[in-house]
């Protein structure tokens, strides 16, 4: 029997990509380990702590807003056919392909000074670029739920709202949760749109760029290490919680 090396080839190709992602993460931690003094100094810098807090809070607020509006939209896209549905679905994906500096210009032109240099501006920029992940995940989650289950619940006397809460939402939850996690992750990584809309109050993403431009790599690297650590930690915990929910 002829030996099939397809899986070995795929594994080798996949390993290259995993290494491409993992190696820079490992290297930045190893480099910072040789400069603990700068890391400790950064951890005690109130300006840095405030910027990190701003990033975490605004990214979390963005994910919650995306859930509030994205889950209902995802449900409608999964359950109903209507004129212009394809256009709506295409529009949902548009923020993914628009350059983020352009997003910042668009938001600034649209909302002007009402979002300039404010928490509202940060959340607005984050929401624009990250909401598609929640909407698409919710839509896919509801599409995976057999609509007949809702119909059976309604024949037994449940309202559409009740059927949604008791059947569709719990069954689609893993997909929705994954979308929310990706929304949060995308939001906390946003820089381009925030630079234009809300340079202040400072977020960690913007502060890293500012420190790099003004003080060089040694000053910006500790903040990057802190953000990678926090993001990875939160991401792993959230994925674990979703995995437990699926089990």
Curated annotation (Swiss-Prot):
Ranges per topology, Extracellular: 30-55, 112-114, 185-222
Primary residence: membrane
Biological-process GO terms, alphabetical: transmembrane transport
Keyword Lyase: no
Pfam families: BPD_transp_1 (PF00528)
Topological type in the membrane: Multi-pass membrane protein
Disulfide cysteine pairs (residue numbers): none
Subcellular location, record wording: Cell membrane
Segments passing through the bilayer: 9-29, 56-76, 91-111, 115-135, 164-184, 223-243
Keyword vocabulary terms for this entry: Cell membrane, Membrane, Molybdenum, Transmembrane, Transmembrane helix, Transport
Domain ABC transmembrane type-1 residue range list: 52-238
Its job: Part of the ABC transporter complex WtpABC involved in molybdate/tungstate import. Probably responsible for the translocation of the substrate across the membrane.
Subunit-level organization: The complex is composed of two ATP-binding proteins (WtpC), two transmembrane proteins (WtpB) and a solute-binding protein (WtpA).
Record family assignment: Belongs to the binding-protein-dependent transport system permease family.
Name recorded for this polypeptide: Molybdate/tungstate transport system permease protein WtpB
Organism per entry: Thermococcus kodakarensis (strain ATCC BAA-918 / JCM 12380 / KOD1) (Pyrococcus kodakaraensis (strain KOD1))
């Amino acid at each position: 029997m002829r030996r099939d090396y397809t899986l070995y080839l795929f594994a080798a190709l996949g390993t290259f990509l995993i290494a491409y992602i993992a190696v820079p993460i490992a290297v930045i931690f190893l480099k910072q380990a040789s400069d603990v003094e700068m890391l400790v100094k950064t951890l005690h810098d109130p300006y840095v702590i405030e910027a990190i807090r701003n990033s975490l809070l605004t990214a979390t607020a963005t994910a919650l807003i995306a859930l509030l509006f994205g889950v209902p939209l995802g449900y409608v896209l999964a359950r109903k056919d209507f004129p212009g549905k394809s256009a709506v679905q295409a529009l949902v994906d548009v923020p993914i392909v628009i350059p983020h500096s352009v997003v910042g210009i668009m938001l600034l032109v649209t909302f002007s000074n009402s979002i300039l240099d404010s928490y509202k501006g940060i959340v607005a920029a984050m929401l624009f670029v990250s909401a598609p992940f929640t909407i698409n995940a919710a839509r896919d989650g509801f599409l995976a739920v057999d609509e007949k289950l809702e119909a059976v619940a309604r024949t037994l006397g449940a309202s559409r709202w009740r059927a949604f809460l008791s059947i569709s939402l719990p069954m689609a939850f893993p997909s929705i949760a994954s979308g929310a996690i990706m929304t949060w992750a995308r939001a906390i990584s946003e820089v381009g749109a925030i630079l234009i809309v809300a340079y202040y109050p400072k977020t960690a993403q913007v502060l890293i760029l500012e420190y790099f431009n003004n003080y060089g790599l040694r000053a910006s690297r500790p903040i990057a290490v802190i953000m990678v650590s926090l993001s990875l930690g939160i991401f792993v915990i959230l994925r674990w919680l979703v995995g437990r929910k699926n089990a």
